[in-house]
Amino acid sequence: MEKTKNKKQSQWAEVFRMLRKNRMAMLGLIILIILVLLALFADLIANYDTIVIKQNLAERLMPPSGKHWLGTDEFGRDIFARLIHGARVSLKVGILAISISVVVGGILGAISGYFGGLIDNAIMRVVDIFLAVPSILLAIAIVSALGPSMLNLMISISVSYVPNFARIVRASVLSIRDQEFIEAAKAIGASNSRIIMKHIIPNSLAPVIVQGTLGVAGAILSTAGLSFIGLGIQPPAPEWGSMLSGGRQYLRYAWWVTTFPGVAIMITILSLNLLGDGLRDALDPRLKQ
């Protein structure tokens, strides 16, 4: 058991070593850390009530300057302040939604792959039904039924991603369920639930970690898209998609109102994709070839 533990530790140490050698992945990680720090300390940088949501029509649509680094929007609110508070919303929704998807999808996929037979067929047919519907349409349908709010937004996005993680975990489980350490656990009388939770799921984490990173990027993009059409975070709360939607009518003569929220979305998605690609290469170097 001790040898197995040490082997796993050395494997993860090798993964981190390879990740550090990937410059693009490290760039993505650094950008992501900066975004997270800005989101965490947003209240210290810009007061929410007096700067982020309070209107100041005397300074509406001001271009970038020393006073307002990224300019102001149609209500005179500082765009930089709203962007960093919006980062908190986007990252929170993206990370929590994908975390829920990983847990639910992982359990369903592990049960399906481990037991097989009728259980596998039943779970996979339900998964196929959900996969037949585009994830953004499924999210729109759920939010439309439940109403726009942050909680409902997270629920809708997490439900739309559960089938993806269920299939990924199932595929991993099918490749390891007949290996010697699983048979050894069965031989000593370990219960099915213990085998799934202690042996199956931990050994299926590599593809889940990669897909989870890319999934957060997709969830942030879905959040922005739903907010853009009025089904996500509601004004005056800052959210990148709603900022894009509110500023599109001023694009011709106040380009900064929509440009900077768009750039924030692009940078965040790019950093997550770079990190996800780096994790994929580190966890399975064969995929690089």
What are these regions (language model features)?
Residues 26-30, 122, 193, 197, ...:
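Signature of the 12-TM Major Facilitator Superfamily
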Residues 1-106, 110-111, 117-118, 132, ...:
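Gly/Trp-centered helix-boundary motif
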Residues 69, 73, 79, 100-105, ...:
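Generic hydrophobic transmembrane alpha-helix motif, especially the helices
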Residues 35, 110, 139-144, 153, ...:
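Transmembrane alpha-helix boundary and packing residues in multipass membrane permease domains
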Residues 98-99, 158-161, 172, 211-216, ...:
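Residue-level hotspots within the lipid-embedded alpha helices of multi-pass solute transporters
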Residues 142-145, 157, 172-173, 222-264:
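Glycine-rich helix-loop "coupling/hinge" segments at transmembrane-helix boundaries
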Residues 88-104, 193-225, 272:
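Transmembrane alpha-helices
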